[in-house]
Amino acid sequence: WASWVIEGSTEKIFFSGDSGYGKHFKDIGESFNGFDIAFIENGQYNEKWADIHMMPNETIQAAIDLKAKVFVPIHWGMFDLSLHKWYEPIESSYSIAQEKGIPIIAPKLGEILTNEVQNKSDLWWRASIEKEENTLKVSAVVE
């Protein structure tokens, strides 16, 4: 698919399209000598779709290969194309990023990011998970 780089006088930003994992991330990271922030696809994955969508561990490896100072997971929690729950990509990637010491920002839908933000650990999506699970419990009791 397609990815692009925005290179300003003081910052470099990487934005990925849908992609399978490969050495191209390391090549790009080396070519641009790393990125201040990398927006990397993180969702709608399945082992059968390895050429077009990365698994969470591959997304984190791509952030490492790109030499990203900060990683922003994108393409998650949207359209249900895969078999995983809507929140699985962010939960998995957040956990792996924390284990590997990769700064991760997961902005709320519509939230504006500024270049001062380095590591935002607001786990806002968990309230939605809890609400969804409680709704399912209530529905099961009512039926």
Predicted regions and their residues:
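Core dinuclear metal-dependent hydrolase active-site scaffold
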Residues: W1-N33, L109-E143
